[in-house]
Amino acid sequence: MRIGYYPGCSLLGSAKEFNESVRAVCEAIDLTLEEVLDWNCCGASSAHALNHDLALALPARILAQAEAAGLEEVLAPCAACFNRLASTRAALEADLVKRQEIVELIELPYSGRVRVLNVLEVLERYRDRIEEKTVNAFRYKVACYYGCLLVRPPDVVKFDRPENPQSMDRLLQSIGAKPIDWACKTECCGASFSVTRTDLVAHLGGRIIADATRRNAAAIVVACPMCQSNLDMRRPEINRRLQQEYRIPVLFVTQALGLAMGIEAQRLGLQRHLVSVELPEPELEVVGDDDDEDD
């Protein structure tokens, strides 16, 4: 089975470990990733605020290149890339006049037939295979953190439940993990304010880190490079603000799956994390037991 692959800028830069772990897990489940040729930046996170046509043209060109390669679907692991590609596809489907303008701008044919999928959407298709290949049950309490861009706006991304998504929970349950019940699943981490308003990111991220820790999660699991960066890289600022020493690691979902499937930590990029990935001894109780706090 093959699927188009759009790594985007983050996965070749600040989130190399996401790219490495996506590729390692897909290889293990016999899913071939065909990288979109001559791809460009999708425009996240500033293009849509600065130039509307540019914000449409950049993702449209990526999808046009995928069409030219004969691809029917494209996996965009970065949540921001997924959101921009899905939003552009929806916008150009709804406005044929604007679609023609963008086609003339990118100088490539574009029909809108290529579907855009996020990493959770793709891996859910292979949940049974992932479960079959699990050799080290991931028996930890985990906080599944979806962030803003995977599930919103719901009429555009058309994925999961916007207020209480479950796809990552199901994936992690398939490898033996116990997702906690918490209210921060889709809270904002501060996103691109990481540079200009570090104080805001420390405030928002601190709430997420504190709640996951209070509920005894062994790790926070994400599917967004920006979320991972803000909760991992900005940990010193978060700890200073809250006068704590929070050490809970922040894993990409593909890293958690990869560990359970016996893939070496080096191949999953765990050494790249700033907050050391030190997991406790796996829990021995039945994963289905629920002793989380009520609020």
Please annotate each region the language model reported.
Residues 1-295:
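Iron-sulfur cluster-binding electron-transfer modules in prokaryotic oxidoreductases
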